[in-house]
Amino acid sequence: MRQRRYRALAAYVGGAATMAGALIAGLISGQVLYARRTIPGAQAPPPQCGGRYGRQYEGEPIALAVLGDSTAAGYGVHTRAQTPGAMLATAVADDAQRPVVLTCTAAVGSPSAWLPAQAENVLDAGGADLAVIFIGANDVTAGVDEEQAVAFLAEAVRTLRAAGSEVVVATCPDLGAIPPILPPLRWLVRRWSRQMARAQRKAVEAEGAYTVPLGELLGPAFDADPDTLFGPDRYHPSAAGYRAAVEVVLPTVLAVLDRAAGRPQHATRPQGTGHRQGTGHRQGTGAVADGAAPVDSSARAAGDPAQTDATKGADADVAGRTPGGAVPCVSQSHSNA
């Protein structure tokens, strides 16, 4: 009699769990459809940012490359100086007191599968002393197999490293911070973002490159202030959001360049430093655009972007290419990131 009761209870619980699972699956499916309707596709290409920066400085130019998706390209901003590539190039030039030649092969909508071609395009444009990659969001939103996505990233890093480039990868952002994505889908997307970032870090560092945990460092700030850090589409960052991303990546970029040049490095590990074993780190300068006011250390520690002044444009005398020979930093599809 008791066994029959247990069996009946188990059947009831199992049935309830199955029903609950079906309801949750249905809810998530509905939220996916809602998010897809709410988040618009890319409407226009971001400003082209490739070119020469820091012309006021003398010496051999530093070759910098930016690869990846819309975060790398700067989708949604209105001026070249607001793009991550321009901000990074200007900061590197100011810090090193040398000119910087920037090649941008990033493309809006890029998954990791496009990275090997982007890396080859960097080499075709003359190579890079340092390459910075922002990637992962489109792989998560498209449900790309994690191992497959990471394999493409590792291939691109390997190609760049074999050509003599140092590489810094900003790993997958926290997509759970995107306002149109609601719970419980938000919880799943956040988990998938973190899993992708962990896998990226492991693969990238195995290739001798450096990583910056973009989601870990910026997710809380975007959660706390979406109106400031997200653009009008509520999916891509605003100019302030891109500035915040540059602020957490910049210290690692500068530290890696210091290490490569044999310059002394500070022992501190500010937000945004990489994780490669034995890397020296130092505080970034905070200067991220020609004519822009530096961001003070308290703003950087809190993850809050500072306001930028009007900035100078760079001379576009270098152009990288995206897969298929397209213009750099332009939309390759109607994907969201």
Residue ranges and their predicted role:
Residues 15, 177-213:
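Substrate-gating cap/lid alpha-helix
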Residues 35-65:
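N-terminal signal-anchor transmembrane helix
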Residues 63-65, 71-151, 295, 299-303, ...:
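Conserved SGNH/GDSL esterase-like catalytic core that processes O-acyl groups on lipids
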Residues 148-151, 155-159, 195-202:
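Alpha-helical scaffolding segments of alpha/beta enzyme cores, especially the outer helices
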Residues 163-165:
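A short helix->loop->beta-strand "cap" motif at the edges of active sites that frequently abuts
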Residues 238:
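Short, conserved phosphate/pyrophosphate- and ester-handling motifs at nucleotide-, phospho-/glycolipid
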